[in-house]
């Protein structure tokens, strides 16, 4: 056993939690001593949980009032606040997401610490239960051998040595020593009830801890999923995802406060036990085990007297006396009564087995083994266990703050998306620079489709037979352009009018270029006149 663990000293956070006021539901001060069967003490733990529940109610009331005010407030100058609101929503979502991730990280550590502490507690309880069960098994086995097996051998030897009074007297003395051994073994504590209680406590604690650990693990995963889906909803500007995550955020907020209430009351009750665990154990076992025995195992000091020393000493002396008697009978009686050798050797083997059991009982009854299990159980639950519960409480508090900010930010994001859609829908559909009109024009073009030029290259004769109609000059583009120019206070420039529909080439062409241009446009003029009507 490590020297640092010889004496148990409760950590400072245990005293910090233990010094909290213990008030019952009638607001009266109660003793902080751990007594889970006392209704008054149960009310003190319930009062702590109700304080946390009151904080949760205030938090939910604040969120509700904020959401109602946000929905009912009149729209002010949105154009001035839209950019600020969008930036605020972004930063709030980012901070709440980081806070939630930090809370989940702290929660993972706290959950692991609590699980380690409870595992160490159950492991120590199992070891102590194994020790006590071993003592009971050895004591019952030795008692059975002394009562049943030894009596059978002595009965047959009495018949063999009936003619020798001195040998019969030795057998009676051995019977008396066996009675002393049985009496001393009976005086030892009966650990059967205690071992059963330890086994039940270890099994129930292990089962509860497994479901607690699994529940927190699922809670961590759900919190991370809510944060990720909320970020996806904000990135994709999805109102449906934001609405769903708003509902899940409220549920997560209530779960955070609920877990905080459970963790606070559990940590406070465990701290009350860890401040004075020996006092509680002595009160619980006073009707099963003597106070001297419990005190011997709880403190295990060299200055304390071993309460089993006298019984074990009598046991050892009685065995030694019986072995001396058997050795004498083997030496002097067997030559006279050869048939007695088998029973005497059987008694000798029984005494050797009983001596081996005595050494094992002495080792198991020593306080160092059970005291080590006791210290390890205390360190597991009072150090790792309570520390883990404090970290879980911090996780719940940070998660509650994160989801409060997230729930308050999502309606702002909703309003921002609604304002964006409303501004988008208010754009004039006839505006040629409207992005929506551009998309509609791209997907549903209204202009005529250009015919393939390959269809006109099938036969030159058919092209030659086509006579181009006389080009009709349309003044519609010119008039439209002039109207637009006059509207904006400018002078119309005919040079900027498109060349579609004009029969003459540009005035800047040279005569050679003009002749080339006319020769190239004579035949396909009918084609272009159909494709691009004037």
Swiss-Prot record:
Keyword tags: Calcium, Cell membrane, Chloride, Chloride channel, Disulfide bond, Glycoprotein, Ion channel, Ion transport, Membrane, Metal-binding, Transmembrane, Transmembrane helix, Transport
Function: May act as a calcium-independent, swelling-dependent volume-regulated anion channel (VRAC-swell) which plays a pivotal role in the process of regulatory volume decrease (RVD) in the brain through the efflux of anions like chloride and organic osmolytes like glutamate. Probable large-conductance Ca(2+)-activated chloride channel.
Disulfide bond entries: 274-382, 300-367
Record note on quaternary structure: Forms cis-homodimers in the presence of Ca(+2) and forms monomers and trans-dimers in the absence of Ca(2+).
Glycosites: 129, 197, 283, 352
Catalytic activity: chloride(in) = chloride(out); L-glutamate(out) = L-glutamate(in)
Motif (RGD): 164-166
Gene Ontology cellular-component terms listed: chloride channel complex; plasma membrane
Binding, Ca(2+): 113, 116
Protein name: Protein tweety homolog 2
Glycoprotein among keywords: yes
GO molecular function, one term: volume-sensitive chloride channel activity
Residues on Extracellular side: 1-44, 109-213, 262-388
Site residues by UniProt (Essential for the formation of the channel-pore): 164
Gene: ttyh2
């Amino acid at each position: 056993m490590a020297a640092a663990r010889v004496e148990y000293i409760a950590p400072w956070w245990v005293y910090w939690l233990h010094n909290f006021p213990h008030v019952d539901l009638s607001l009266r001060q109660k003793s902080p001593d751990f007594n889970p069967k006392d209704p008054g003490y149960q009310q003190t733990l319930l009062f702590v949980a109700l304080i946390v529940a009151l904080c949760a109610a205030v938090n939910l009331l604040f969120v509700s009032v904020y959401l109602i005010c946000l929905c009912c407030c009149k729209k002010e100058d949105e154009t001035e606040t839209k950019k600020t609101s969008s930036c605020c929503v972004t930063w709030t979502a980012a901070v709440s997401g980081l806070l939630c991730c930090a809370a989940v990280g702290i929660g993972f550590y706290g959950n692991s610490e609590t699980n380690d502490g409870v595992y160490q507690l159950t492991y120590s309880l199992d070891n102590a239960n194994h020790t006590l069960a071993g003592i009971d098994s050895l004591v019952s086995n030795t008692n059975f051998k002394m009562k049943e097996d030894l009596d059978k051998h002595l009965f047959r030897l009495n018949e063999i040595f009936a003619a020798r009074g001195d040998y019969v007297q030795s057998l009676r003395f051995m019977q008396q020593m066996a009675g002393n051994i049985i009496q001393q073994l009976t005086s030892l504590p009966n650990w059967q009830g205690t071992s059963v209680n330890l086994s039940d406590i270890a099994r129930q604690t292990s089962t509860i801890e497994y479901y607690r650990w699994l529940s927190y693990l699922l809670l961590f995963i759900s919190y991370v999923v809510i944060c990720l889906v909320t970020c996806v909803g904000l990135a994709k500007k999805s109102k449906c995802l934001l609405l769903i995550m708003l509902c899940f955020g409220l549920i997560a907020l209530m779960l955070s406060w609920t877990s905080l209430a459970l963790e606070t009351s559990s940590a406070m009750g465990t701290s009350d036990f860890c401040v004075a665990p020996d006092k509680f154990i002595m009160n619980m076992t006073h009707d099963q085990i003597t106070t001297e025995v419990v005190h011997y195992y709880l403190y295990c000091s060299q200055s304390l007297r071993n309460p089993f020393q006298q019984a074990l000493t009598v046991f050892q002396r009685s065995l030694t006396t019986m072995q001396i008697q058997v050795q004498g009978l083997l030496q002097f009686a067997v030559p006279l009564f050869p048939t007695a050798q088998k029973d005497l050797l059987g008694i000798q083997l029984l005494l050797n087995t009983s001596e081996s059991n005595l050494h094992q009982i002495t080792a198991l009854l020593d306080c160092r083994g059970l005291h080590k299990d006791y210290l390890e159980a205390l360190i597991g639950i009072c150090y790792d266990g309570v520390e883990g519960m404090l970290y879980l409480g911090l996780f719940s508090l940070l998660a509650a703050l994160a989801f409060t900010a997230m729930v308050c930010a999502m309606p702002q994001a909703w309003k921002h998306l609604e304002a964006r859609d409303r501004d988008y829908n208010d754009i004039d559909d006839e505006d040629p620079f409207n992005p929506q009109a551009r998309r509609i024009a791209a997907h549903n073009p209204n202009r005529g489709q250009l015919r393939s030029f390959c269809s006109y290259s099938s036969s030159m004769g058919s092209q030659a037979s086509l006579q181009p109609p006389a080009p009709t000059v349309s003044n519609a583009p010119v008039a439209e352009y002039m109207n637009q120019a006059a509207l904006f206070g400018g002078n119309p420039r005919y040079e900027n009018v498109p060349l579609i529909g004009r029969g003459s080439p540009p005035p800047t062409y040279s005569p050679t270029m003009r002749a080339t241009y006319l020769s190239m446009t004579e035949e396909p003029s009918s084609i272009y006149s159909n494709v691009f009507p004037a």
